[in-house]
């Protein structure tokens, strides 16, 4: 199969940039918008709404594998954009009506986001067969996506503050419409994402993979570590977003919180990856690094608890620490699950990973979207972040002590 031209590569990266800018801009304010218009009913409803969105945006494609295999990447991407635009246009009436309608609307939004992300990644894998070219293209689109993640929140917070919610939604919708129009030009037509095995075989084997995982302590440990890490990750666009919005009236500072996270990940990923490689060469496995990342998430939340009392600059420091944890956690999820179950089909492990991340991030979004608005009137949100800090730090400390004890026994 031919390598895509440089112009095609550049066009795909533009699409990634637009999607990332729209996504990060939308999610940096969505929890704030929902809290402002739905929390009058119940802060629990806000948490449930964010949980539904996270669940569908992370894991919905796992359950429509047959449809995905029968559709071209262009069709999948256009369908996803259609769902996104339609759901955003319905968002305002959905927030003012029956809460179940809001849940359905956010589920549709999540499905659209999931389809677009899955189809774009799948298109690159299916179209570019040369591994070096594939890696180079993924590096390019990751860089442009991170750039979009840095710019999107700054622009969105400025537009929201200066011109209001209606124009903000129009701009986000406009970005997705433009991306949809760009898709048939950017993507090669008649490209399909196909698995080597049939959907029936995949379905039966993933069920067996889940069942078998519960029989192995090592696998259960890896699953729990990944699950807790995904809960931590789910805080960024839920509880943390609500705190950011209340810390400053400046749209620049509000947007800066998210931009710092994106920029920090860009700057830190390579040096952190080198440290991980060195540790693995010395015998450490991926699960042990993920548990370490939980401790770093915990430190981040402990700092964040100190900052939410109005010291926004401490929150900036906590975000930099949060980014270090992301740099460790995100690249190692697949590796940890494969290490724990090396005899299982890779496609099942990848789907399994999506399910764990979807449930974990949904739980994190739900907790942040529910508890933070509930505790804020009493000025007690710091307790929530302290509790999360303990959830991350305790396993990391225990794991470290067990590791040291094991090394002493080996030396003796």
Describe the residue ranges of each PLM region:
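A membrane-interface helix-boundary motif in multi-pass transporters
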Residues: 161-176, 372-392
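Cytoplasmic helix-loop-helix junction between adjacent transmembrane helices
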Residues: 107-144
């Amino acid at each position: 199969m031919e390598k895509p031209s440089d112009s095609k590569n550049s066009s795909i990266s533009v699409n990634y940039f637009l999607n990332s800018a729209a996504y990060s801009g939308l999610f940096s304010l969505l929890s704030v918008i929902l809290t402002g218009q739905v929390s009058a009913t119940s802060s629990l409803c806000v948490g449930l709404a964010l949980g539904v969105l996270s669940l569908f945006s992370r894991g919905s494609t796992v359950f429509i594998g047959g449809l995905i295999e029968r559709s071209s990447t262009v069709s999948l991407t256009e369908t996803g954009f259609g769902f996104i635009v339609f759901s955003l246009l319905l968002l305002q009436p959905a927030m003012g009506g029956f809460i179940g309608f809001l849940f359905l609307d956010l589920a549709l939004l999540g499905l659209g986001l999931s389809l677009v992300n899955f189809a774009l990644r799948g298109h690159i894998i299916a179209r570019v067969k040369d591994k070096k070219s594939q890696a180079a293209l993924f590096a390019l689109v990751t860089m442009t996506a991170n750039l979009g993640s840095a710019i999107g929140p700054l622009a969105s917070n400025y537009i929201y503050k200066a011109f209001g919610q209606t124009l903000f939604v129009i701009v986000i919708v406009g970005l997705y419409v433009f991306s949809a129009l760009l898709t048939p030009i950017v993507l090669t037509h008649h490209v399909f994402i196909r698995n080597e095995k049939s959907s029936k075989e995949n379905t039966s084997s993933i069920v067996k993979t889940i069942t078998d995982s519960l029989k192995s302590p090592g696998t259960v440990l890896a699953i729990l570590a990944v699950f807790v890490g995904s809960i931590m990750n789910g805080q960024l666009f839920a509880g943390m977003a609500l705190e950011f919005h209340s810390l400053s009236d400046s749209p620049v500072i509000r947007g800066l919180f998210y931009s710092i996270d994106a920029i920090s990940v860009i700057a830190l990923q390579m040096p952190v990856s080198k440290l991980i490689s060195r540790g693995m060469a010395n015998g450490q496995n991926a699960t042990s690094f993920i548990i370490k990342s939980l401790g770093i998430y915990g430190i981040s939340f402990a700092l964040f608890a100190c900052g939410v009392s109005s010291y926004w600059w401490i929150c900036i420091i906590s975000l930099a620490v949060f980014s270090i944890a992301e740099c460790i956690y995100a690249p190692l999820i697949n590796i940890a699950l494969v290490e724990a179950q090396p005899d299982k089909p890779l496609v099942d492990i990848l789907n399994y990973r999506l399910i764990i991340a979807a449930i974990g991030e949904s739980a994190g979004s739900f907790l942040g979207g529910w508890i933070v608005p509930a505790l804020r009137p009493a000025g007690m949100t710091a307790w929530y972040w302290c509790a999360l800090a303990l959830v991350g730090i305790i396993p990391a400390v225990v794991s470290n002590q067990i590791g040291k004890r094991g090394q002493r026994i080996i030396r003796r």
